[in-house]
Amino acid sequence: MKTAKTQPDDRAARVALCKVGEPMDPTIATLVQERGTVGAWRAIATNADGAYDRFAARVSDLDLARVLHAADRLGIRVLVPGDPGWPRGLDDLELAPLCLWVRGCVDLAAVLARSVSVVGARLATAYGESVAGEIAHDLAVRRFAVVSGGAYGIDTAAHRGALAGDGVTIAAMAGGVDRLYPAGNHDLLEEIARTGAVVSECPPGASPQRHRFLARNRLIAAMTPGTVVVEAGIRSGSLNTARNAERLHRVVAAVPGPVTSTASVGTNELIRQGIASLVTDAAECAELFGELGADLAPRVEGAPAVGDDLPEVPRRVLEALPVRRSSTVDQLTRSAGLSVGDVLGGLGALEMRGLAARSPDGWRRAG
């Protein structure tokens, strides 16, 4: 590295460590904790006793000024802890990212203060994509930013739904923000970068790899106050996101699916284990993730049944009245467990309401 002998500041040291290491690297994390970012970088760059040989090739190739210049040319900015736009939720992670690479002009800290992560299976069903899109759209209308991972399936539906609701959506990448992945979502991710943000802890040029996806999932969980899993099989990576959210004491929700669908086994299990609250729409998500008492979902109630508003005696007489045949007053006293006077009074009230009718053989329900 051409700048190995310089004395970098915290920001430069974080960028350098990010370039030579991997997300959640335990060696770098320990060094930063013990020596600070500048001391950690100095130890790795000098490699005095050969303890950090595994970083040597990347250290040798690193030209920090060139990295930062290339990022600036591509419209990529670097956020570090303490910056005004730094997502404060990331500080809750045991292995927090050294820095965040961002394409997009939104103030991340501001939009993430009222946000929801919407995640789920890549191989989603039509049901899952429809529900994810509708939830994300309606959350955006309610001024929630929607965070997801940019993948096919539920992630795509969530991003598109938020955009359709004229909202802000943020895509967290498992590779560099200059290598938008998957390729089939390139145009969508470009639109997200223009209107919201595409973010990653991996530096520009980094390719998406499996371990980076797992590391990325913890960012999705940490950045927002809550995560909703729309559809997930039993081995879906979105379950990893949900469990990260639970460990971080974030609110977790899941949309139930058909018990016959393998695509919903994971979400149903999250609900069964008590990890996730059951939600069915954006209103219920907003109630969970929004300000206490400010985003209440309407109660779901069925249509009132005939006679629900009646006093007790007429209601008991109505319940005792047959539908297809008539009944005498004596029979009604036995069926309803009431006196003759109560039955006659109840029948009179029901007749006035059009709920009971006289017949040659006694009384029956009207209609």
Labelled PLM ranges:
Residues 1-9, 74, 78-367:
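Glycine-biased, small-residue-rich flexible motifs in mid-sequence functional cores and linkers
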Residues 1-87, 353-362, 366-367:
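Short, small/acidic-rich helices and loops at N termini and domain boundaries
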